[in-house]
Amino acid sequence: MRMTVVKHVMLTLICGTLSWGVQINTLAYASAIKSEDGFDMDEDGVYGDDIQDYINAAYTHERPFIQDKSKHKMETYTQSLLHTDLETDSQISRERGNYINAQELGDGNNEHVDLVNRTMTKNVLMKHGHRNFMDASILYKSVHGITHLHAHQRPTEVSVAENQQLLLKVHIPQENEHTYTERWSFLPAAPCKLTPPSIQQVCIKHGACIHDVVVDVDCIAESMEHTLVEIGYVVHASKAVHPTWTVVNITEDFANYGFDTPDVKPGVLKFEHMNAHHAGVYIWNLQGTHGENMYVTFLVKLNNSIENHIDLPAVTPKPKGAEFHTWHYHSHVFSVGETFSLPMHLQYKIHDTPFDLLLEWLYVPINPTCQPMRLYSACVYHETVPSCLSPENPECTFASPHIARRVANTVYQNCEHVNYTADCLAVSHVEPGSGLEIQNGGSALLFVNAAESMSGLYVFIIHFNGHVETVAYTVVSTIENFVNAIEEHGFPPEIHNVPSPSSPNVTANNDVISETNTFPFKTYAGITGGFAVLALVCLALALVCTKRKFGHRSYWSDKAAYGQSTYYAGVPVDDFEDDTEVEVDEGAECGGSGYTVYIDKRTR
């Protein structure tokens, strides 16, 4: 059982995992042939015996012989298998074993492998239902190159009242004459009094989440996983024998926990009297001599009001916002006078409608002496951080978008369709004289008769409802001026010795004012001070009036970009410092963020 510590709050026990311990990326050379006439069908209509014979025989023959024959004989077997029903467990087990063993002989023909696996899956599911679903899945998953089959299931939560019986039970495999070893491990909850273990949704990445047992990182050192009991047994071939298994060994380790000896048999762990010491995480692991490897996890809680406990179905929260992913090249070399396209291939899922979308292209020239150029993507999300506005070595740095050139952008406002490029109105703008054109709804740039001066670092930014969602970049240059570019995820070093605009340089005056000249000076200072106070009061009143009219955010306007319409882009602010109430004029919309795209509808 592998554990991973999650930052600050959790340790994830990756559980409910089924791994058969065999690599079946390709099930090759199962078509090792007996004769040019193909395989001999047995009485059940299955060619398994012939295949197994020649899989075994292949170890004593030259591999090229097997490879040459398999290419044109595999089809005979697979086409026949399409019309063959696997009626019994023994046939299914035998066929699966044949193909698992076959993988050791080579890479095989993937097209035929696909056909065999889909046929096996169909037969198993139709004839044997849920119990053999994993048998079928193993064959199907192999087609897609999955080395191990991991079946993530939600851990089971068990609440038991004090002094009541605690029974944990798992369905065990019934493969005839197979030997299995089971291990029950225990992670006590007692050391985690403030934050006991719980079942939570754990996300490996956006949209890829599983339910797992989460243990607070602060109590991991005190609450370690220990083996409680280990049991080995053999499954009998005849179901007439009861029980259908024989225990061959059992080891126990309960002394450290003060447990009474439980009732243990294959797939079962039972305590007669539940108490606080029994609460925690129980992990059942089964390993077999044929590569089986299964995990099941239980979260056991002490509940003094078990009669009032109601298991509610898990509620998966509805995804919000949007997801954008880009595929692109990080460099493009061109010749002067060439016309070419610079695309950003987008894959996206939009969960909230209506929405505002801004696709913009920014540009900074490249300096051939910079090796490399550096893009600080954190500055795209935090445009006004001082080190982003005044980065060290600015000629070789892309930091805040405020100090870059916006060469093109496309705006989709109040769009109610997920397919925004086809169903929503777009407003695009390209910097005049740039030699650029917008393509693919704003996600690509067309360079027309590209000049040397168009070489630069082009940064593509997607804003969804005013928030930056994706940042991508490409260096476009001639071969003579090519430089590499790398993305840094922190903030750039700030340039040193930059005079602050709010602190002008003042030269000290060492002249001494005589006592006789102090009266005119005081009079002048009093008059000047009075005017200054009056000016400050007027300025404060003007700011209050302006704030009430336009809200607490400032906006810049570029009427030339859209003709009669006015395009507004939010000036970023610190949301933690500015918590005043937003007032928006009637007829306009604001997304409520320092990075919000804001378009006045009345001017459209």
UniProtKB/Swiss-Prot annotation:
It is found in: Virion membrane; Host cell membrane; Host cell junction; Host Golgi apparatus membrane. One of its GO terms (cellular component) is viral envelope. SUPFAM superfamilies: Immunoglobulin. It comes from Cercopithecine herpesvirus 9 (strain DHV). Residues 25-526 are virion surface. It is a single-pass type I membrane protein; Single-pass membrane protein. Residues 574-586 are annotated as: Acidic. Keywords: Disulfide bond, Glycoprotein, Host cell junction, Host cell membrane, Host endosome, Host Golgi apparatus, Host membrane, Membrane, Signal, Transmembrane, Transmembrane helix, Viral envelope protein, Virion. In epithelial cells, the heterodimer gE/gI is required for the cell-to-cell spread of the virus, by sorting nascent virions to cell junctions. Once the virus reaches the cell junctions, virus particles can spread to adjacent cells extremely rapidly through interactions with cellular receptors that accumulate at these junctions. Implicated in basolateral spread in polarized cells. In neuronal cells, gE/gI is essential for the anterograde spread of the infection throughout the host nervous system. Phosphorylated within the acidic cluster. Phosphorylation determines whether endocytosed viral gE traffics to the trans-Golgi network or recycles to the cell membrane. This is Envelope glycoprotein E. Belongs to the alphaherpesvirinae glycoprotein E family. Disulfide bonds join C370-C396, C379-C388, C415-C424. The chain crosses the membrane at residues 527-544.
